[in-house]
Structure formats: C-alpha cells, structure tokens
Regions:
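Extracytoplasmic copper-binding redox domains, predominantly the cupredoxin/blue-copper superfamily
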Residues: 1-89
Length: 89
C-alpha cells in the first residue's frame, strides 16, 4: 500500500491491508524539508507501529508486523492533525 503526504496532510486517508500477516507501506513524503512519518495506533491509543521520521522529498518503505483484523487510526507523529484510517481484513 502507498500513503502520501503533501502540504502537511495525508492525501491518502483510507487504506486497506491484510490482517494477520506482515505488510509494507510505501510512504511518500512530498513536503520539501518537512519531517513526517506514519504511526499506526491500537484502539487503546498505544502504538501498533511507528515508522521512522524523515524529511521530504523522499520515500521510505516501512515493514509493518502482522496485526489482527480491525480498523486502526494512523497519524504523523510530528503533525498529529495529519490522520487517516487503516482497515485490515
């Protein structure tokens, strides 16, 4: 799956992935010299996954461990107003 950040917002706010097996996220940070990452949250607010923070313009491939089926909010650790939803089936 691909998640894109541009103008301090995720342009991809709804993504689907596989439940119960590891998957990858290609995270494209299109904001010049601006730090972003993707952080996936559990229902209790704790981190299910926290990707490396890096400055754009660049792309990182995140290796996400297996997570149970469900809906997970994701955000940028640096800019918490950047949000989206990951659905694992």
């Amino acid at each position: 799956m691909t998640i894109i950040a541009s103008q301090v917002a995720f342009t991809t706010t709804q993504v689907d992935g596989p439940a119960g097996k590891p998957f990858t996220i290609a995270f494209e940070n299109n904001d010049q010299a601006t730090q972003h990452n993707v952080e996936i949250k559990k229902s209790d607010g704790s981190d299910a996954f926290k990707g490396q923070i890096f400055a754009g313009v660049a792309t990182k491939i995140y290796q996400v461990p297996a997570l149970p089926a469900g809906t997970y909010p994701f955000n940028c650790s640096v800019h918490p107003s950047m949000t989206g939803t990951l659905t694992l089936k």
